[in-house]
């Protein structure tokens, strides 16, 4: 079946920013008295706010701060890192190839619009998408399929004709629950087992073309 739309995740998929978010989380953890390793402590594919219950439990954190406040502090720390954020190799060429083939492109992110807009504008991708959906627009984040089904509705695209490009297990699950094909972007060797249920796994956008997408 011919794919009519490609829906991209943002953080860790279009953007190589796992380490930048890791430093942001670690900065807030340090302010709470937690010393962590240099490794990013967050769970990929879920929102910043949604990460904090996991981190509070993992590090047995005692704090009066709300999840909203912890998320706000994390996002503020991330914004100090956005000069270091880069676009994944091959993305611009892949998008141009999709557009030349008449395939719509959209963004579905677990992030907020405020943060997504700032980082997209910073890396020069602020106006390329036919539709954008952020976590504020749905009742539940990934792995719930709502982000992707709403995005398909915005595009006027049939769900089974949509392809999602993701970098996390929760994102892959969400796309599959939405009835969509999935390409997984694997940034680290250890990710491939986690991403194994995807229809295709690649390391960067240089490995895929509109022709590959249409044949999935």
Language model features by range: what are they?
Residues 1-4, 96-99, 112-113, 117-216:
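Asp-based, Mg2+/Mn2+-dependent phosphohydrolase catalytic module
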Residues 3-92, 96-101:
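N-terminal helical cap/lid subdomain that shapes the substrate entry/recognition surface
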Residues 87, 108, 140:
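Residue-level marker of regulatory loop/turn positions in helix-turn-helix DNA-binding domains and
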Residues 35, 104, 181:
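Residue-level detector of anion-binding/catalytic polar loops
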Residues 106-107, 184:
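Hydrophobic beta-strand core positions in alpha/beta domains
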Residues 13, 109-111:
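Conserved phosphate-coupling serine/threonine residues in phosphotransfer and NTP-handling enzymes
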Residues 41-42, 60, 81, 106, ...:
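Short, flexible active-site loop motifs that bind/organize anionic cofactors or intermediates
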